[in-house]
UniProtKB/Swiss-Prot annotation:
Belongs to the eukaryotic ribosomal protein eS25 family. It comes from the Eukaryota. It holds the Pfam family Ribosomal_S25. Residues 1-13 have a biased composition (Basic and acidic residues). This is Small ribosomal subunit protein eS25. The gene is RPS25-1. It comes from Encephalitozoon cuniculi (strain GB-M1) (Microsporidian parasite). Residues 1-34 are annotated as: Disordered.
Length: 109
């Protein structure tokens, strides 16, 4: 075996400092997702807005209510159940994962 000649510390430092290699990728500097704070409670004003808009809609899901009014999906589901009990919307289709409602005014037309 051939013995390697050891480089001095100065040569190693110069070699490391020279820009021959590409800069190392820094991990963790990627895009950061914006945190959206969703409402957990529903005020009477918001419920009145939802009641007005949902009554005219042909199809309503909990995702539509949650994204439009910035509500948690569970809260949106509770709002739709409440409106269904009031008679503003009517359940059209439902299974264990998703429930689809339709506004009562939209069904009459």
């Amino acid at each position: 075996m051939v013995k390697k000649i050891q480089e001095s510390k100065e040569k190693k430092a110069l070699k490391a400092a020279s820009g021959t290699r590409k800069d190392k990728k820094k991990w963790g500097d990627g895009r950061k997702k914006e945190e959206v704070r969703r409402a957990v409670t529903v005020s009477e004003e918001l419920l009145a807005k939802v009641r007005k808009d949902v009554g005219r809609a042909s199809v309503v899901t909990r995702y539509m209510i949650g994204s439009r009014y910035n509500l948690n999906l569970g809260v949106a589901e509770n709002v739709l159940r409440h409106l269904s009990n009031e008679g503003v919307v009517q359940q059209v289709l439902g299974n264990r994962r998703m429930t689809i409602y339709a506004g009562c005014r939209a069904q009459e037309q």
